[in-house]
A protein has these predicted regions:
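Catalytic domains that recognize anionic headgroups
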Residues: 1-183
Length: 183
């Protein structure tokens, strides 16, 4: 089954996920937060009806206070670390943090964490988004001949910080140094 006629009422982060899980509009009723105990997730309904569900994601908010209880509604899940301010790389690892090129760019601990996380994601193959999609493709290959399953490949990007590796920046003549990446 292909879902190609779905419209979200809440575009930001966790409110949009709650809509995907419950089919209920979240906007104007509730802010950023977890699924509630009374929420009925589509993935639990799928399980009750014999459909196996799997999540591949690099969305670290699933493991934070206020964002939890989504990923455990799937039968199984894989999470890939290192997006945004994900507390992945230890604080004592030095990272080169460029000067703030725009007053619109965010500053502070989550930016510092982002640059520390990049020390583990130097190549495209190491990027959490690449690893997320690769895991989803592996799942598809392993389950292509099977029936009654649902796969969700959920990439955090596009999401601030808008980090673009230099080889892609060069394709469009963009400056080597990042300018506005975290408004």
């Amino acid at each position: 089954t292909r879902f190609d006629n779905f419209y979200s009422g809440s575009l930001p982060c966790m409110p949009a996920r709650r809509e995907l899980h419950t089919g209920k509009y979240n906007f104007l009723y509730r802010g950023w937060g977890p699924l509630e105990p009374f929420d009925r997730s589509v993935f639990e309904v799928l399980r009750q009806n014999g459909v196996y569900s799997h999540l591949c994601t690099d969305h670290s908010h699933y493991w934070e206070d206020g964002g939890a209880t989504y990923h455990n509604r799937y039968d199984t899940w894989e999470g890939f670390r290192g997006q945004e301010g994900d507390r992945y790389v230890a604080h004592d690892i030095r990272a080169e943090i460029p000067p703030r090129a725009s007053a619109l760019n965010k500053a502070g601990i989550s930016v510092e964490q982002h640059y520390r996380n990049r020390t583990r994601q130097r190549t495209e193959d190491e990027m959490s988004g690449t690893r997320t999609v690769r895991a989803g493709l592996e799942f598809l290959a392993e389950h292509a001949d099977r029936d009654n399953w649902f796969l969700q490949i959920e990439c955090f990007d596009p999401h601030e910080p808008f980090y673009v590796p230099q080889n892609y920046r060069a394709l469009y003549g963009l400056p080597e140094q990042e300018t506005l990446n975290w408004p």
